[in-house]
């Protein structure tokens, strides 16, 4: 669909270009006065100047400054997300010296004054990043330390140059900026506010100090202020004020040209305010309806340079006409048209009057010089003199007048030349206009004979049968080149589409930012700190363990641990020794009872018994003796004897019972 629209627009523009090519613009004097006869040496070429130039001002013209936004800047307005937070540290220490430290950030709704004060501190370089206060742990108590901070996070938003509203995915609706004040906007999250960085309320795109400015020449078609107003500039050519409309862009009043370009008037105070008078008093310029501002693409425009070249070429042709005129050569209507200015205004106009004269020349042959008059035939001689004559055109008068030139258009498709005044449609070239304005003399040519008169600056007035008249204007106007390029400039203009805010999704065209906080998850808006999130996932045990190695009771706890460890080891050692001694006494007692039974001859069935005892030997050392008693032999046998280096407390015995 978009491609189809582009093709339709291109076809319309090309059709307009063809229409312009079928139309020719010429300059014709409409009011002449002060006719005088002058010498041919006094004929001068007109002062030609570029129609789009603002360096040459004629009577009734003024220059104003027009500006437009630069395409290098964006539509972002700098600002901050303002949040009020309490950074809190809670230390809980039990009576048994277990410490638990809890870190958390609590979100609080900030006030506008708090955000504005923090903004001032940040702009002055006094901004302090938030931090947790130092921990203060007290035995068998809960201590809470907190610091309140206003945090500012840089976050630019979009400012629509057409509606001058602020848009962002975090806003519930477009926000209106305040000029020369700090702008504060609400967001979906009631705990967060947006505050502007600057007080101008304008983004870089809409700051007129960075705009591109050009001089524009303004003039009326007539002295009457109610008549048509024209704007001329090297950048956008010639624009009729009746084809523009008022449109506000970036908060500034401006005009929208017929090719779609938007310009703002940046007046310096030295002008008469032609455009303001035209807008306010005449009410000729209406408000734009359903039109979008546009800007021209960065492209080199050669219209101004082409006109400069044409001016130099026209001036060279005019100098050639003066040379022929001063040399006494015949000046054709085309040569005379180069004396006509190529732009409207007050200039001289020239009309030449020629007459037919008869010239003769003597043809002298032999002996004819003796005769006093070569025109007399000397028939009595063989050789005679003679002469010949001919009819020629001779310049009789050069008439000059002061005229006001208007620009006329002519449709080339019509068989008869019809001219229409571009400034005043009421002016028509009819018989009255020809007789009163286009004063003429009979057109005389030395080769062709036809009815016609020659008027100002080579304008030819043809008449057939003395009734039907046709006006031929050989001069040209700079509008021929300007109007064609004016249509072509529409192809270089791009419309500026404004931003669209979707209230349901919070999204903005050209800015696909997904909202961070929505209405459906506002209940979790305070869960913003990482420490609280980690603690909820299992850091309680870690904090309890690390609490032992922190707080003011650290030294006391290590001392108690050391004393407790010493007493625990000593107690365990004593218990082991007591249990070992008690075990040895039981074994010795049981062995004695068994040995007594063996000595008195009591049978022990099929069980054999072994005994290990410690006995002193003759060398003053102790031997470890293992005795084996068997029921068959009824005897005790010494199996092994080991010599011990030392003896501990009491007799060491081991009893082993097994079946035989």
From Swiss-Prot:
The keyword Transmembrane applies. Its main location: virion. Residues 580-660 are intravirion. GO terms for cellular component: membrane; viral envelope; virion membrane. Residues 1-22 form the signal peptide. Attaches the virus to host cellular receptor, inducing endocytosis of the virion. In the endosome, the acidic pH induces conformational changes in the glycoprotein trimer, which trigger fusion between virus and cell membrane. Homotrimer. Interacts with matrix protein. This is Glycoprotein. It comes from Adelaide River virus (ARV). The lineage of its organism: Viruses, Riboviria, Orthornavirae, Negarnaviricota, Haploviricotina. The gene is G.
């Amino acid at each position: 669909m978009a491609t189809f629209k582009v093709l339709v627009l291109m076809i319309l523009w090309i059709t307009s270009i063809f229409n312009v090519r079928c139309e020719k613009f010429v300059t014709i004097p409409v009011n002449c006065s002060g006719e005088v006869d002058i010498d041919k040496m006094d004929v001068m070429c007109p002062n030609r100047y570029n129609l789009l130039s603002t360096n040459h001002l004629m009577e009734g013209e003024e220059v104003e400054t027009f500006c437009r936004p630069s395409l290098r800047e964006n539509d972002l307005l700098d600002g901050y997300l303002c949040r009020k937070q309490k950074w809190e540290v809670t230390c809980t220490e039990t009576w048994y010296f277990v410490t638990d430290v809890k870190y958390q950030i609590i979100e609080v709704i900030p006030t506008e004054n708090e955000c504005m004060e923090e903004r001032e501190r940040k702009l002055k370089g006094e901004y302090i990043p938030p931090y947790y206060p130092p921990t203060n742990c007290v035995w068998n108590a809960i201590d809470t330390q907190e610091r309140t901070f206003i945090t500012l996070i840089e976050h630019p938003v979009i400012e629509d140059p057409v509606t001058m509203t602020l848009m962002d995915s975090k806003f519930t609706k477009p926000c209106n900026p305040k000029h020369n004040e700090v702008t504060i906007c609400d967001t979906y999250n009631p705990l967060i506010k947006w505050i502007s960085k600057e007080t101008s309320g304008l983004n870089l795109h809409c700051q007129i100090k960075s705009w591109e400015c050009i001089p524009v020449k303004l003039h009326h078609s007539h002295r009457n202020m109610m008549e048509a107003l024209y704007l001329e500039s090297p950048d956008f050519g010639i624009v009729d004020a009746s084809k523009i409309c008022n449109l506000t862009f970036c908060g500034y009043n401006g005009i929208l040209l017929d090719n779609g370009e938007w310009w703002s008037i940046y007046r310096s105070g030295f002008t008469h305010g032609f455009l303001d008078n035209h807008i306010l008093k005449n009410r000729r310029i209406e408000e734009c309806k359903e039109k979008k501002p546009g800007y021209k693409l960065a492209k080199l425009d050669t219209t101004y340079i082409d006109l400069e070249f044409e001016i130099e070429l026209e001036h060279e042709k005019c100098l050639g006409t003066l040379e022929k005129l001063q040399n006494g050569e015949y000046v054709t209507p085309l040569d005379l048209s180069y004396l006509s200015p190529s732009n409207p205004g007050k200039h001289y106009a020239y009309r030449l009057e020629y007459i037919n004269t008869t010239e003769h020349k003597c043809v002298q042959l032999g002996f004819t010089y003796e005769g006093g008059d070569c025109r007399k035939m000397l028939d009595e001689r063989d050789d005679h003199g003679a002469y010949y004559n001919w009819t020629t055109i001779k310049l009789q008068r050069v008439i000059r007048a002061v005229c006001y030139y208007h620009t006329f258009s002519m449709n080339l498709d019509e068989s008869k030349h019809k001219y229409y005044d571009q400034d005043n449609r009421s002016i028509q070239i009819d018989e009255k206009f020809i007789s009163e304005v286009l004063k003429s003399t009979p057109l005389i040519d030395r080769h062709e004979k036809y009815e016609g008169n020659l008027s100002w600056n080579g304008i030819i007035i043809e008449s057939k049968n003395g009734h039907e008249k046709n006006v031929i204007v050989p001069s040209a106007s700079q509008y021929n080149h300007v109007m064609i390029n004016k249509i072509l400039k529409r192809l270089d203009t791009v419309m500026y589409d404004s931003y669209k805010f979707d209230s349901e999704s919070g999204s903005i065209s050209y800015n696909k930012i997904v909202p961070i906080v929505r209405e459906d998850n506002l209940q979790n808006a305070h869960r913003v700190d990482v420490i609280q999130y980690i603690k909820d996932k299992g850091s309680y045990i870690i904090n309890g363990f690390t609490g032992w190695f922190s707080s003011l009771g650290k030294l006391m706890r290590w001392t108690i641990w050391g004393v407790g460890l010493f007493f625990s080891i000593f107690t365990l050692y004593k218990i082991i020794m007591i249990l070992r001694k008690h075990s040895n006494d039981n074994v010795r007692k049981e062995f004695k009872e068994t040995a007594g039974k063996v000595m008195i001859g009591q049978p022990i069935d099929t069980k054999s018994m072994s005994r290990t005892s410690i006995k002193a030997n003759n060398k003053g050392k102790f031997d470890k003796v293992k005795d084996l008693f068997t029921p068959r032999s009824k005897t005790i046998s010494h199996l092994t004897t080991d010599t011990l280096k030392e003896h501990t407390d009491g007799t060491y015995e081991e009893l082993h019972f097994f079946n035989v």
